[in-house]
C-alpha cells in the first residue's frame, strides 16, 4: 500500500528518487502516466496492466472512453528504478506536470502521484475545506 507524503528533488537529468519504502514494491517495474489534476501517476506494472485491461473492456463507441484510453496508453512510460531507486521522467511528463526541482510524491493507496511542490500546495489549499465534508459522500459511511 502506498501512503504518505515525500519531497524528493528532480535532478538536472530529469531523474527522481523514489521513496525508499516503496522501492521493493516497484522493483519489478512500473508505469508512469499522466494523472489527474496535472500530476503524474506511478503504478506497479501489474496494477497498471489490470487497470488497462479494465479500460479496454469499456465500449470504444463511447467518445469519453476512447479519449481516456488513448491518453492513458499514449502517455504510459515503462520504467525500472536504477540501483539508487531513481526513475527518469520524460520531458513530456515533466512538462505536463509542470515539474521543477522541488517535487512531492504522495501515496494514493494503490499508486503514487508525482506533483510539482507548488502545484501540490495550491491543490491542498484549494481542496482542504471540502476534505472533511466529503468523507461521507466519498466513503459512504464505510469507516
UniProtKB/Swiss-Prot annotation:
Localization of this protein: Cytoplasm, Nucleoid
Record's keyword terms, sorted: Cytoplasm, DNA-binding, Repeat, Transcription, Transcription regulation
Domain SpoVT-AbrB: residue ranges: 5-47, 76-119
GO BP of this protein: negative regulation of DNA-templated transcription initiation
Family per record: Belongs to the MraZ family.
Subunit structure: Forms oligomers.
Descriptive protein name: Transcriptional regulator MraZ
Amino acid at each position: 500500500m502506498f501512503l504518505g507524503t515525500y519531497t524528493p528533488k528532480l535532478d538536472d537529468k530529469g531523474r527522481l528518487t523514489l521513496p525508499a519504502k516503496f522501492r521493493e514494491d516497484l522493483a519489478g517495474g512500473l508505469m508512469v502516466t499522466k494523472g489527474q489534476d496535472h500530476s503524474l501517476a506511478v503504478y506497479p506494472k501489474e496494477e497498471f496492466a489490470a487497470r488497462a485491461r479494465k479500460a479496454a473492456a469499456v465500449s470504444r463507441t463511447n467518445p469519453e472512453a476512447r479519449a481516456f484510453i488513448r491518453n492513458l496508453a499514449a502517455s504510459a512510460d515503462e520504467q525500472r528504478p536504477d540501483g539508487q531507486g531513481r526513475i527518469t521522467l520524460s520531458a513530456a511528463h515533466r512538462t505536463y506536470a509542470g515539474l521543477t526541482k522541488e517535487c512531492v510524491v504522495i501515496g494514493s493507496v494503490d499508486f503514487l502521484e508525482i506533483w510539482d511542490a507548488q502545484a501540490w500546495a495550491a491543490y491542498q489549499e484549494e481542496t482542504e475545506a471540502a476534505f472533511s465534508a466529503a468523507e461521507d459522500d466519498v466513503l459512504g459511511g464505510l469507516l
